[in-house]
Amino acid sequence: MNANYIWLIAGLGNPEAKYDGSRHNAGFAALDYLAGKWGISVNKTKFQGLWGQGEVEGHKVVLLKPLTYMNLSGDSIAPLAGFFKIPADHVVVLCDDITQNPGKLRIRPSGSAGGHNGLKSIIARLGGDGFPRIRIGVGAKPHPDYDLAAWVLGKFPPEDAKALADRWPDLEAAAKLIMDGKLGLAQSKYNG
């Protein structure tokens, strides 16, 4: 990882207000937390998203909330990364994960989409899966026959929302370690 490159941190979600607080918008919620902690206003509109830039502990950072809807997230991320000449290994994606309990973090340096359509779109548009991601546990469907779309677009019950909020400081620390070139340490400290 080259320290001279800008970092892009993208939180995935759906843009309409009716999706606020939904499981699928865990990435938006995480990005909002980082923006608040780092004092970065995410209010510029371009690249089919809301974005802002700043500096975090010596790292130039662009924060992005794609407004393309989840399944087309790459249509926002790839053009912004191209504009700022950000290589894929400096694109950190924050997204929901239905295979993890609420609040659990799963940090990976790269990998498949694992059935996540937002990640599929990003992989297609960036031309590969070599970008770090922090997957945020939102819990599994309560029953195998439960409609997946209804589950991920559903709102968090209060106890699950608290489980996520309690992990935002860990997610922030993990993001900083990734930018410091210490992804392995982020995994060992914060996965789970």
For the regions a protein language model found, what residue spans apply to each?
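Hydrophobic alpha-helical segments within soluble ligand-binding/sensing domains
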Residues: G114-G118
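Nucleotide and nucleotide-moiety/phosphate-recognizing core
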Residues: M1-S110, K120-I134, K141-D147, G154, ...
